[in-house]
């Protein structure tokens, strides 16, 4: 009688190792399948359509599963997760508008979360500022780059605005007659930030300055942010005062009503004169 001893191959065992990605969205994760036992000639079948090999690099975060089969068809399987640090994100980015057109009083502030450790900041302004808040900014678009302690980065842009340039238009009325003070001027601001304050050279603090004689008048307009504009308006007057010449055009006999007189005005404004005679007549010619 003969006997034979049938020996089992060593137990097929599988262990998985994983290295996390350096950042939440980088392709540098790694998995490794470590196999012991069984009967050589291992075949690796990964669920993620990865190649038949024990180690894979350049991976995104996520779960990776593998089935290992030896030369005898024995199988073992397991899964492992390639981790990552918390995603570095920008929670908010806000700005403070420039106070007056053309100034550099704007600012921008960024708030970030996630990532690893402390953050470094770099703004795209002319000063290349390196804090969470960039100051002394003129109007424009700025980008901030945030880097955490492992080198992960995120960036975002913000546009710092400014009010329109404060300017002054006028609605002016000339003096009606030469050497009179009945002209007026209204300052009409555009741009800046309402409400406005007015300071005329005459001392008036209203939008309209009244009782103006012929001449130049300066006004300063200040908006709600302290921005100022200065401008000048000219009040005119007729070139000449109204002058009147009377002429007798018809002469009748003594005691009769055949006399006729005509008024001949010059100067003033335009040719649309009105007349008032002492006897009540209101035409240019009195009979």
Report each predicted region and the residues it spans.
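Proline- and Ser/Thr-rich low-complexity, intrinsically disordered segments
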Residues: 1-287
């Amino acid at each position: 009688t003969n006997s034979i001893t049938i020996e089992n191959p060593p137990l097929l065992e599988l262990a998985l190792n994983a290295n996390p990605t350096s950042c939440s969205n980088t392709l540098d994760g790694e998995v490794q399948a470590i196999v012991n036992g069984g009967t050589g000639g291992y075949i690796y079948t990964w669920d993620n359509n990865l190649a038949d090999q024990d180690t894979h690099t350049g991976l995104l975060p996520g779960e990776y599963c593998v089935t290992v089969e030896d030369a005898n068809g024995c199988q073992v399987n397991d899964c492992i997760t390639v981790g990552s640090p918390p995603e570095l994100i920008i929670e908010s980015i806000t700005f403070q508008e420039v106070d007056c057109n053309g100034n550099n009083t704007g600012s921008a502030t960024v708030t970030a979360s996630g990532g690893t450790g402390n953050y470094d900041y770099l703004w795209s302004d002319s000063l290349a500022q390196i804090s969470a808040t960039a100051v002394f900014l003129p109007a424009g678009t700025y980008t901030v780059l945030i880097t955490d302690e492992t080198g992960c980065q995120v960036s975002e842009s913000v546009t710092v605005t400014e009010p329109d340039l404060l300017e002054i238009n006028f609605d002016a009325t000339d003096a009606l007659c030469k050497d009179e003070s009945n002209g007026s001027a209204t300052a009409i601001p555009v741009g800046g930030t309402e409400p406005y304050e007015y300071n005329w050279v005459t001392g008036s603090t209203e939008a309209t300055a009244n009782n103006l004689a012929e001449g130049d008048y300066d006004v300063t307009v200040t908006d709600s942010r302290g921005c100022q504009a200065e401008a000048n308006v000219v009040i005119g007057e007729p070139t000449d005062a109204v002058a009147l010449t009377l002429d007798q055009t018809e002469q009748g006999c003594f005691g009769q009503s055949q006399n006729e007189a005509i008024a001949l005005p010059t100067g003033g404004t335009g040719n649309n004169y009105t007349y008032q005679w002492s006897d009540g007549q209101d035409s240019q010619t009195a009979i």
